[in-house]
A protein has these predicted regions:
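Cytosolic juxtamembrane N-terminal segment immediately preceding the first transmembrane helix
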Residues: 1-47
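Extracytoplasmic gate region of multi-pass secondary transporters
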Residues: 47-48, 220-273
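Central cavity-lining transmembrane alpha-helices of secondary-active solute carriers
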Residues: 66-81, 262-274
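Conserved MFS/SLC helix-loop-helix module at the cytosolic interface between two early adjacent transmembrane helices
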Residues: 74-110
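Structural signature of the two symmetry-related core transmembrane helices
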Residues: 90-104, 287-302
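Cytoplasmic helix-loop-helix junction between adjacent transmembrane helices
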Residues: 118-155
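Glycine-rich segments within core transmembrane alpha-helices of 12-TM secondary carriers
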Residues: 145-172, 189, 353-365
């Protein structure tokens, strides 16, 4: 859509992109990212789900669980840095190649080492490309669509979580059946991603900045306040979603290993679509306070559930309530990550924020191994409180990005 247009200044580029009408190129960009995030959602809970496979001994569960965030962490840091250097579009073929190799490895795996390496490789590709995808979407979409598109695309990961968890619930009697359905679902997303990615344009913002950055004095990494706030948000969402929905199953409720991520993923997917109605009607700062305050309170109620030994049904209700605030917190974070960094450092900035969170997540898997459910929930509540602090800081010290052009 921009090949026939020439730009003399960066403001011309921004005005052109920010005021554009939705067209076929926007549809292709949204579709390829939705398919990629859906496949990532399938992979996001693959590690805890495959701990049920007989060739994974309980003593190796923790290493399987770590393989997923380890691959995602490596992918985020490497791909985020490279995307600022060589462009967004070029990396999308690399990421999908790595992801496909990992998926094939998961299907063919017959032992612990193979599944470990395959999950790492798949997450490196599809999980690692989230950084590049968020930067690309924020840079290419008009202001009036930017927030909704970022939420819509990232929410497809929740749909993937719910879908693959449902497969493991229904087909839990057969590893072969699980693998075949997983392969079919992955291939459907991968095929759409490949076809659409071949038609993707390069990020126009990145192209202009990369060739004129010496003239653009505003292309600096940024002040510490936005970076700190984004790190606090990332710590909350990464630790609480992954820990409550993914890790709680294998450690504390082995009978419900598939059911817990299914309920949480389905709840977040449904709420994600509902959030589209009001995400651009409320300022980002207020939305962040709503999300992280609600999440902190709902997580604290889990402590009462454990203290009074309430039925598992009550746990499910609390899980759904927390899923709403979890999705709202996820949405705010997904929107603000690309909005608060400049184009020259957007990939590196998002990768840095996510890198800190996933590093802590990996540490927490080992640190929390064997602790009581009550102490576990105290940790989760404290993690939500971290995000609440970040939201208060951003509300009082930050600036509004709703309906504002990004640099």
């Amino acid at each position: 859509m921009e090949k026939d247009v020439e730009f003399s200044t960066y403001n011309d580029v921004k005005n052109f992109l920010d005021s554009a009408r939705w067209n076929r190129t926007h549809t292709i960009m949204a579709l390829t990212m939705i398919s990629g995030f859906f496949v990532w959602g399938l992979l996001l809970v693959t590690a805890p789900l495959v701990t049920q496979w007989p060739f994974i001994s309980p003593s190796n569960d923790i290493y399987v669980l770590v393989s997923s965030p380890a691959g995602l962490l490596a992918g985020n840091l490497i791909l985020g840095y490279l995307s600022d250097k060589i462009g967004r579009k070029k990396l999308f073929i690399t990421t999908i190649t790595s992801g496909i190799a990992g998926i094939i490895g998961i299907i063919l795996s017959t032992n612990f080492i193979e599944i470990l390496a395959s999950i790492f490789l798949a997450e490196f590709g599809f999980g690692g490309e989230e950084t590049v995808s968020l930067a690309f979407l924020a840079e290419q979409f008009p202001i009036r669509y930017r927030g909704k598109v970022l939420v819509l695309v990232s929410n497809s990961a929740n749909a993937g979580v719910a879908a693959i968890s449902a497969v493991f619930i229904v087909a839990g009697y057969s590893i072969f059946t699980e693998k075949m359905i997983f392969l079919a679902m992955s291939l459907s997303g991968v095929i759409i991603a490949i076809v659409t990615r071949l038609k993707l344009p390069e990020s126009l913002r990145w192209s202009f900045v990369s060739s004129h950055y010496a003239e653009l004095t505003d292309q600096r990494f940024g002040s510490p306040v936005p970076i700190m706030v984004l790190m606090l948000f990332a710590i909350t969402i990464v630790l609480t979603f992954a820990l409550v929905a993914d890790i709680l199953g294998p450690y504390e409720y082995p009978k419900y290993t598939s059911l817990i991520p299914f309920i949480y993923g389905l709840g977040e997917a449904v709420f994600g679509y509902a959030i589209l109605v009001f995400v651009d009607r409320i300022g980002r700062r207020m939305l962040s306070v709503m999300a992280y305050a609600g999440g902190t309170v709902s997580m604290a109620v889990f402590l009462l559930y454990i203290y009074f030994r309430l039925p598992f049904d009550v746990f499910v209700i609390l899980l759904v309530v927390n899923a709403f605030f979890g999705e709202l917190g996820w949405a705010v974070r997904e929107i603000l990550q690309p909005e608060l960094f400049v184009t020259r450092y957007r990939g590196l900035g998002i990768a840095t924020v996510r890198g800190v969170a996933y590093s802590l997540y990996i540490i927490s898997i080992f640190a929390l191994s064997g602790i009581s459910v009550y102490n576990y929930m105290i940790f989760a509540t404290a993690a939500w409180s971290v995000g609440l602090i970040g939201s208060i800081v951003w509300y009082s010290k930050g600036y509004e990005t709703l309906n504002r052009s990004i640099s």
